[in-house]
Amino acid sequence: MGQVKGETGAGAPALKVSGLRYEVADRMLLDGVDLQVRAGESAAVVGPSGSGKSTLLGCVLGLIRPTQGKVEVAGQDVVRMRQRALERHRSRYMGVVFQFGELLPELTPVENVALAALLGGTPSDQAYERAETLLRDLGVPYEGAPTGQLSGGERQRTAVARALINQPAVLLADEPTGALDRATRDSVTELLFDVPKRWGCALVVVTHDFEVADRADRCLELTAAALVPRKAGDRS
């Protein structure tokens, strides 16, 4: 796929979160959160339900406006962007994988993946060519059967391909293995954490599964509204 868009020079972070603060109904979910992830690097964020993990991803995506702080993706602060500019920036520089894939079941895998590129303005022939290449690389049968007939692992691989089709600077994954059996979880986990090295983007995985989190280059825990380092293998 080549060099990802949004690279800002050697060593520059693809994602930089600075002093992020968010509270709702007098409850502090994020209090001065900092996070930097560089191209080719992975970070996992763990924490109990309700700790603010998905809120953090929402702030990175620009779906939630923090009380204060900055979220720089590919060198630009999404917090201060107007809606239309934010949507363009998100489409160009961010890819997302959710727990249940969020794919259209009636479309084939190649149609699902190409659709994301078409919505981003890629010409049809290029969109389908890139979609087929990605799905082939990720081991997904892309012709014939609709996506709804694929196995859980194949659907998640299709979701990863869709997230990568626009060559994002940052790939975000929210509980991407939560609905999978153990064997399929391990396969999808291996695929996900291979993405930064193969495609050159930054990867942030939010998960409650410590075995998944341990595969990341860095593991952090969101606790008491703060993001703190966590040692690999620590289950306490």
Where are these predicted regions, by residue range?
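Helix-to-loop junction immediately C-terminal to a conserved catalytic motif
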Residues: 61
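ABC ATPase NBD coupling module
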Residues: 78-95
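Catalytic Walker B motif of ABC-type/P-loop ATPase nucleotide-binding domains
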Residues: 171-174
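Short coil-to-helix segment of the ABC ATPase nucleotide-binding domain corresponding to the Q-loop/switch region
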Residues: 107-115
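Conserved ABC ATPase signature
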Residues: 146-150, 154-156
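Conserved catalytic motifs of ABC-family nucleotide-binding domains
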Residues: 167
